[in-house]
Amino acid sequence: MNWQLLARANTHPLRISILEVLAIDDGRTLSPNELSQELRTPLSNVNYHVVQLLNSGLVELAGEHPVRGATEHFYRLPALSPAEA
């Protein structure tokens, strides 16, 4: 694990909140839109930070769903390997 990336990814309070929401109930799968509503934060801000978490490996793409000519993406926390658990 790249600890520098992990530390940098967790320096923003919104990223921590996103990770906390995704961790509820042993892991949830949510779209940035759903996270935005739950966190009462603008979608553009949530989407930016979800992409940063995705790039750092702290969340993973769980699926896609077509919505009105666009594609809604859903994210979750990656599963821990037995060595990490």
Model-derived regions, located:
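Short, cationic-aromatic polyanion-contact patches
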Residues: 6-14, 31, 62-85
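Short helix-capping/hinge SLiMs at alpha-helix to coil transitions
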Residues: 23-27
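Key DNA-contacting residues within the recognition helix of helix-turn-helix
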Residues: 46-47
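Pre-recognition alpha-helix immediately N-terminal to the DNA-recognition helix
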Residues: 16-21
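Short, hydrophobic-biased segments on the C-terminal half of alpha helices
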Residues: 50-51
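A short acidic, leucine-rich amphipathic alpha-helix
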Residues: 34-37
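Glycine-centered, phosphate/nucleic-acid-interacting loop/turn motifs that mediate DNA/RNA or nucleotide
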Residues: 57-58
